[in-house]
Amino acid sequence: CISARYPCSNSKDCCSGNCGTFWTCFIRKDPCSKECLAP
């Protein structure tokens, strides 16, 4: 999986980068969805 850190406050907008708390966004190969977890 490819992981990247984005500033966000919850898993819903993890990859949008609009919030202050850093989460880790994992882009899963299958089913090609984004799963966001706390660091």
UniProtKB/Swiss-Prot annotation:
Tissue distribution: Expressed by the venom gland.
GO CC annotations on file: extracellular region
Compartments, record wording: Secreted
Xref: InterPro entries: Spider_insecticidal_peptide
Keywords for this protein: Disulfide bond, Knottin, Secreted, Toxin
GO molecular-function terms, A-Z: toxin activity
Predominant cellular place of this UniProt entry's protein: secreted
Domain of life: Eukaryota
Pfam families, alphabetized: Toxin_21
Disulphide bond pairs: C1-C15, C8-C19, C14-C36, C25-C32
Disulfide bond keyword on record: yes
Keyword Disulfide bond attributed: yes
Similarity-based family: Belongs to the neurotoxin 13 (insecticidal toxin ABC) family. 02 (Calisoga) subfamily.
Entry domain remark: The presence of a 'disulfide through disulfide knot' structurally defines this protein as a knottin.
Role: Causes paralysis to insect larvae (H.virescens). This toxin is active only on insects.
Protein name (Swiss-Prot/TrEMBL): U1-nemetoxin-Csp1b
Species lineage: Eukaryota, Metazoa, Ecdysozoa, Arthropoda, Chelicerata
